[in-house]
Amino acid sequence: MSRPVYTLYCSPDSASFIVRLALRLTGAEFAERQIDRPSGELDSPAYRAMHPLGKIPAIETPDGPMFETAAILMYLAERHPGLAPAQGSAERAAFLKWYFYTVTNLHAPLMQVFYPERVAGAECAVAVVAHQATKLQEHFAILDQMVARDAPDWLSARPSIFSFYVGVMVRWLSGFPAGHPARLTTADLPALGPILAQLETCSAAQDVAKAEGCAPTIFTAAY
């Protein structure tokens, strides 16, 4: 058996889910190391040496350990052609601006909705969730409008780091109960919804769904 090119440190249905999907697209050999959160492994010296904040994911690569989901995805796309528009291609500029729009305006406020106490303490959690949930709804609507208008190949039913990144975030937001201000499903996204419905049927998505113990409808009926 060949030695894995990558080792992903992961936890079920966390941000490592996104990286796991991308790794499946690369076709490269990779190993998975499940983190024992209850035992405090995230705070262990060995893990903190890879990720100084003790968060998931982290990944060992041929160029050393990496952390931050968006950085890992970009690294994989640069090493494995086809996961994102190539440098110098006509689509590269549009891809980059919307990729970093997603990092800043979707992923960051999403994390604040799930962990509001990190922003301003437990006493302000309700206000933080309400504010950031409104921003999330607005920012997802802007992204959906762009997809309807431009139909970019890098955010389509063709698997890519961008489509999987957005899909997993919609997955998480769909897990909130009806009436929660941050709840968002594929039904709320006229352009993106059908794309994610197709995307979840690809082999990479189905393989990861099985490995994670999820229903095969990982984006459209996640929970």
Question: What residues fall within each predicted segment?
Answer:
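GST-like domain detector, emphasizing the conserved glutathione-binding G-site
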Residues: 1-130
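Acidic/histidine-enriched, glycine/proline-rich intrinsically disordered or flexible terminal extensions
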Residues: 212-223
